[in-house]
Amino acid sequence: MKSRGLVRFFFSILAVGALITSIVGFALKWGEYRGLFLTFEAGQIFSVLFWFIGVGMIFSVISQMGFFVFLTVHRFALEILRSSSLWNLLQLFFILFVAFDLMYVRFLFFGESGESLAGYAWLPVFLLIFGVITAYIKQKQSSKKTFVSSLFLMVVITALEWFPALRVNDEDWLYLMLFPLMACNAFQLLMLPKFAAK
């Protein structure tokens, strides 16, 4: 990729992170921010918006670092194992392991008496479904060989990037961080070839 394309790619991901974080941020706290829009308190609206944009850009940078790690690990794994089928099996194992951990470990650490394990299942299931859809689109875009690796990025790498919010376990922060990370990772996965071709 040429330097101009790399810069455009970087700033495009920043924009995706800022946009999604702003939308999710206002949606999560709409009860609080609704009054600002009804009375059109522009100063406070823009103050909150700039904060969301800044946070979203941080999330997008985390996503880009995760994507770089993914590309590096993928390349090294193929060179060391010398078998794409073995690497795919390992990736599938990690995908299932992480998806289970997102449910079970969170339940162990944060579950309260009376809560069921099922209450912690929907976020990893949602992440898996989104990952499968994104990986399917990537497969259609390139080849069948990319499906498992794409799913690995969307589940395992996203979960690693999401760890700060998982550790805090604040519901608003869980959503505020997850959706931008998913969007940025999907954008990088699907749009990198188009930027590289320019």
Curated annotation (Swiss-Prot):
GO biological process: positive regulation of sporulation resulting in formation of a cellular spore; sporulation resulting in formation of a cellular spore
Cysteines joined through disulfide linkages: none
Transmembrane recorded as keyword: yes
Intracellular or extracellular location(s): Cell membrane
Subcellular location, principal: membrane
InterPro entries associated with the record: KinB-signalling_activ (IPR024164)
Function: Involved in the activation of the KinB signaling pathway of sporulation.
The protein's name in its UniProt record: KinB-signaling pathway activation protein
Native species: Bacillus subtilis (strain 168)
Gene (name only): kbaA
